[in-house]
UniProtKB/Swiss-Prot annotation:
Domain of life assignment: Bacteria
Annotated SMART domains: HATPase_c
Family: Belongs to the anti-sigma-factor family.
Catalytic activity: L-seryl-[protein] + ATP = O-phospho-L-seryl-[protein] + ADP + H(+); L-threonyl-[protein] + ATP = O-phospho-L-threonyl-[protein] + ADP + H(+)
A UniProt-annotated Pfam family: HATPase_c_2
Keywords for this protein: ATP-binding, Kinase, Nucleotide-binding, Serine/threonine-protein kinase, Transferase
Protein known as: Serine-protein kinase RsbW
UniProt source species: Bacillus pumilus (strain SAFR-032)
Gene: rsbW
Cross-referenced HAMAP family: Anti_sigma_B (MF_00638)
UniProt GO molecular function: ATP binding; protein serine kinase activity; protein serine/threonine kinase activity; sigma factor antagonist activity
Taxon lineage: Bacteria, Bacillati, Bacillota, Bacilli, Bacillales
Function: Negative regulator of sigma-B activity. Phosphorylates and inactivates its specific antagonist protein, RsbV. Upon phosphorylation of RsbV, RsbW is released and binds to sigma-B, thereby blocking its ability to form an RNA polymerase holoenzyme (E-sigma-B).
E.C. number(s) listed in UniProt: 2.7.11.1
Length: 162
């Protein structure tokens, strides 16, 4: 069975001031798909974390290298897949998870290890997260539409009649 997918691709300079463009695009795509407000906010946080990690860490220490962050939105009928990739420095994801250990409700903010919270947020807010660290880092995240799906056209029609 072939699934229909719409692909939206963007590349931004690896600079913090461009992460907002990705957030705005994501918000529009997710809204059009029918995600509810809370889900859109979760998506924006997770994607912002992935982009910010790329901006802050990927090209650190690479003299004069202006890197870029590539973001792909794969729009399916039942889910949104988002891939954030850079070609900068990579890291050992499994080792990083082991070093940081699990976060629990018993931890206070002061007890949290510096770094790694972004990965935790991505894993908490998204349905699926996969990190590949080869030549650069690629973070693939998936969020499924749930039963509270908003019918965008019906919502607009209701608004226009009220």
């Amino acid at each position: 069975m072939n699934e229909t997918v719409d692909l939206i691709e963007m590349k931004i300079p690896a600079k913090p001031e461009y992460v907002g463009i990705i957030r705005l695009t994501l918000s529009g795509v997710a809204s059009r798909m029918g995600y509810v407000y809370e889900e859109i906010e979760d998506l924006k946080i997770a994607v912002s974390e992935a982009c910010t990690n790329a901006v802050q860490h990927a090209y650190k220490g690479k003299d004069g290298e202006d890197g870029e962050v590539a973001v792909r939105f794969l729009v399916y009928e039942d889910r949104l897949e988002i891939i954030v990739a850079d070609k900068g420095g990579s890291f050992d994801f499994k080792q990083k998870q082991e070093d940081l250990g699990p976060y629990t409700t018993a931890h206070t903010v002061d007890q949290l290890a510096e770094g790694g919270l972004g990965l935790y947020l991505m894993q908490t807010l998204m349905d699926e997260v996969e990190v590949q660290a080869n030549s650069g880092v690629t973070v693939a995240m998936t969020k499924f539409l749930n039963r509270e799906r908003v019918d965008h056209d019906t919502t607009i029609q209701n608004y226009e009649t009220n």
